[in-house]
Structure formats: structure tokens, C-alpha cells
UniProtKB/Swiss-Prot annotation:
Keyword Repeat in record: yes
Name of the protein in question: Kelch repeat protein B10
PANTHER family in UniProt: CALICIN, KELCH PROTEIN
Organism in which the protein naturally occurs: Vaccinia virus (strain Ankara) (VACV)
Record-stated family: Belongs to the poxviruses Kelch family.
Record keywords: Kelch repeat, Repeat
């Protein structure tokens, strides 16, 4: 009987992460981590695991620590929106209005747009090349034409 516990644990026990899959790879991004001093830290990395190739999660640094952010993927690229961020690991948490992109093939990050409102808790989805950013704290939905970013940053068929 399957116990429901994955056999390859992630490197850090953290909560409030955002996760997405691209092909056979799982990305677990940001979140909160409680260190040995019992302090809560916003995580500035993501962990990556190819379920068919990797035996251990690899760690990828993010440009800023993030938690409660939205994430989605298209054409092999990861897109992030909103959430709380901190530029220094022990700095102040701030609402974030960035929409950014990560290319796993090149390990490069790009800022592609900004939401009108700074959003502390968000979800992100893409439908027909339009990104929808859902604000869970203020109840707004913002939409952005994602096609320019998709054309510029990915190896999409467009």
C-alpha cells in the first residue's frame, strides 16, 4: 500500500511554498523555513527534482526571498507573481507587485511586468497567452497579455 510519502525528501522543511511541474521536473519555490534559533525565514531558493533522473533535490537561488506567490509554467518557463518578498533574508516583508520569469534551461531570471496593486497572497494562471493574477487578500483579478514575454523569453512555437 502506498504511504503517500515521496521517497526523495526536499532539502529544507518549509511551509507555504508554491510548486509547479514542467515536463518531468518539479519545482518547489520560496516558502517559510524555521531555523535552529526558532526564527521564521522567508526562503530565497527553489528546489528542483527530475522524477526520472535525480536522486536528490537540487537548489536554485532566486533573486529575492518569496512566500505566498503565484506560479505557473508555459513552454518550459516558470512565471511568478505577487506574494510577500524580502530582498535580504532577515529584512522586512513587503507586498510584491512583480511578474517575473525563470528559464530553467539557461538558469536566468527576467522581470516582465508589474501588477497594479501590490499583492501579499496571490495565485497565477495562464489561459490563451493571458496571465491572470488573483489577489487573495484584496479580491482583485488582474490580467496581462503574456504573448510578448512568451515570444521573447521562451522557445515557444509562436
Amino acid at each position: 500500500m502506498d504511504s503517500g510519502i515521496y521517497e526523495t525528501p526536499i532539502n529544507y522543511k518549509k511551509s507555504n511554498v508554491s510548486a509547479v511541474s514542467v515536463n518531468n521536473t518539479i519545482f518547489v519555490t520560496g516558502g517559510l523555513f524555521i531555523n535552529n534559533s526558532n526564527s521564521t525565514i522567508v526562503v530565497n531558493n527553489m528546489e528542483k527534482l527530475d522524477i526520472y533522473k535525480d536522486k536528490q533535490w537540487s537548489i536554485i537561488e532566486m533573486p529575492m526571498a518569496r512566500v505566498y506567490h503565484g506560479i505557473d509554467s508555459t513552454f518550459g518557463m516558470l512565471y511568478f507573481a505577487g506574494g510577500l518578498s524580502v530582498t535580504e533574508q532577515y529584512g522586512n516583508l513587503e507586498k510584491n507587485n512583480e511578474i517575473s520569469c525563470y528559464n530553467p534551461r539557461t538558469n536566468k531570471w527576467f522581470d516582465i511586468s508589474y501588477t497594479i496593486y501590490k499583492i501579499s497572497i496571490s495565485s497565477l494562471c495562464k489561459l490563451n497567452n493571458v496571465f491572470y493574477v488573483f489577489s487573495k487578500d484584496i479580491g482583485y483579478v488582474e490580467k496581462y497579455d503574456g504573448l510578448p514575454a512568451i515570444k521573447a523569453l521562451s522557445t515557444s512555437p509562436y
